[in-house]
Amino acid sequence: MAKIAINGFGRIGRLALRRILEVPGLEVVAINDLTDAKMLAHLFKYDSSQGRFNGEIEVKEGAFVVNGKEVKVFAEADPEKLPWGDLGIDVVLECTGFFTKKEKAEAHVRAGAKKVVISAPAGNDLKTIVFNVNNEDLDGTETVISGASCTTNCLAPMAKVLNDKFGIEKGFMTTIHAFTNDQNTLDGPHRKGDLRRARAAAVSIIPNSTGAAKAISQVIPDLAGKLDGNAQRVPVPTGSITELVSVLKKKVTVEEINAAMKEAADESFGYTEDPIVSADVVGINYGSLFDATLTKIVDVNGSQLVKTAAWYDNEMSYTSQLVRTLAYFAKIAK
């Protein structure tokens, strides 16, 4: 049984606990977050986007009791001071968003943990993993890895199929993305000085940047320099879609594209021909759900523009992939 600690009990940290409770061989034994434990337990139990937690949680001195099992709760700002060695922590799931550099994340290792998985994009000095795309790049000797971003986890399986089967010359991706807590609920100064994210999240379509297209090269090196992209934040709390417009090396048909995607489907990469909307993907465990009804091809002067699209729950889809990576990393650890 691998012992897991979660550092940062926000949107991803709380959903990670839900998922880990369903995964044999993993046990969350500790959580670290600076927020009051009573508040954390309430936010874990009641979730506006993902629904109520079906199990039981109660707060006691210095701990939660989740489905009858005690989970220690700490409120320590410096990860290096956490008792990971005493608790025998195998892997820390780093979900604060603050310790995304290798040196900073290694504070958990210095505190006694064996491994760290960062729930965010990280630097080029770390392996960036999208499960069922490049997790076999891991050999178990790594101490810190990145689970990439929610959008990279959506884009990578679709891009891999296109590149493996037909070859990608170049492409541009757009994620139509739910709003997140780095936006304002009402107009006001943004903490990072972003004039667009300073505007009310639930009122407008808000253009934003995304690193997913460039980060894809950390997952699929053959795509380095071939993709770019942007994001459009829209007024829904979760449920997003990524569109990829590509120029391929081979002439293709819609049927060939869809057949290739269907053949590649697995636990991480779903396939649907249903006319779904974003509300239908809230809570799914696929990291990416390919929508065959949205595949389009335009022939232009002997060349083709190929548009493909995949849905994802930017919260639960990503968390499910993150936990798969976590479980695999714990299993192969050396």
UniProtKB/Swiss-Prot annotation:
Summary of pH dependence: Optimum pH is 9.3. Above pH 10, stability decreases rapidly.
Binding locations of NAD(+): R11, I12, D33, S119, N181, N314
Temperature impact on function: Optimum temperature is 10 degrees Celsius. Above 65 degrees Celsius no activity is detected.
Enzyme class of the recorded protein, top EC level: oxidoreductase
Organism lineage string: Bacteria, Bacillati, Bacillota, Clostridia, Eubacteriales
Pfam families: Gp_dh_C, Gp_dh_N
Listed pathway(s): Carbohydrate degradation; glycolysis; pyruvate from D-glyceraldehyde 3-phosphate: step 1/5
The EC number(s) this enzyme carries: 1.2.1.12
A GO biological-process term: glucose metabolic process
Name of protein: Glyceraldehyde-3-phosphate dehydrogenase
One annotated GO molecular function: NAD binding
Record-listed D-glyceraldehyde 3-phosphate binding positions: S149, C150, T151, T180, R197, T210, G211, R233
Protein purpose: Catalyzes the oxidative phosphorylation of glyceraldehyde 3-phosphate (G3P) to 1,3-bisphosphoglycerate (BPG) using the cofactor NAD. The first reaction step involves the formation of a hemiacetal intermediate between G3P and a cysteine residue, and this hemiacetal intermediate is then oxidized to a thioester, with concomitant reduction of NAD to NADH. The reduced NADH is then exchanged with the second NAD, and the thioester is attacked by a nucleophilic inorganic phosphate to produce BPG.
Compartment annotation: Cytoplasm
Gene3D superfamilies, alphabetized: Dihydrodipicolinate Reductase, domain 2, NAD(P)-binding Rossmann-like Domain
UniProt entry keywords in alphabetical sequence: Cytoplasm, Glycolysis, NAD, Nucleotide-binding, Oxidoreductase
Sequence similarity: Belongs to the glyceraldehyde-3-phosphate dehydrogenase family.
InterPro entries associated with the record: GlycerAld/Erythrose_P_DH, GlycerAld_3-P_DH_AS, GlycerAld_3-P_DH_cat, GlycerAld_3-P_DH_NAD(P)-bd, Glyceraldehyde-3-P_DH_1, NAD(P)-bd_dom_sf
Record site: Activates thiol group during catalysis: H177
Quaternary context: Homotetramer.
Catalytic residues identified in the record: C150 (nucleophile)
Name of the gene encoding the protein in the UniProt record: gap
Signal peptide from the UniProt entry: none
GO cellular component, one term: cytoplasm
Organism annotation: Clostridium acetobutylicum (strain ATCC 824 / DSM 792 / JCM 1419 / IAM 19013 / LMG 5710 / NBRC 13948 / NRRL B-527 / VKM B-1787 / 2291 / W)
Keyword Lipid metabolism listed: no
Location (main, coarse): cytoplasm
